[in-house]
Regions:
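Eukaryotic intrinsically disordered, low-complexity regulatory linkers and tails enriched in Ser/Thr/Pro
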Residues: 1-9, 90-102
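Conserved binding/recognition cores within well-folded domains
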Residues: 1-79, 83-85
Length: 102
């Protein structure tokens, strides 16, 4: 499956397996894959398109569960070395999602 994106004046298809995470800043969402793509859409729009390998974490981030290497109460480490802050209250739901997806 692929995510269809219109960014930088062109239409792109990004395979789900390439997407590590998505995060939001103001009114823009950045899709972090092999390259980063920033588009003016809501995180909720993406959440509807993505499948169960993705988990929304708080208001500002969606993670691809297969890239998660380690989770603590305050941060998530991805397999590429990226460390992301974990919002308060997100630890338990994220752990449940990881267990269900395994």
């Amino acid at each position: 499956r692929c995510l269809n994106l219109e960014a930088y004046g062109e239409m792109m298809r990004i395979p789900f397996y390439e997407i590590r995470y998505l995060d939001v800043h103001q009114n823009y969402v950045t899709v972090h894959a092999k390259a980063d793509y920033t588009v003016k859409r809501t995180l909720g729009d993406f959440e509807k398109e993505l499948d169960d390998r993705f988990c929304r974490v708080g208001r500002a981030m969606i993670l691809n569960l297969k890239y998660i290497q380690r989770v603590t109460k305050t941060e998530v480490r991805l397999s590429d070395g990226t460390v992301l802050p974990l919002p308060r209250g997100a630890y338990e739901p994220l752990n449940r999602a990881i267990i269900q997806h395994a």
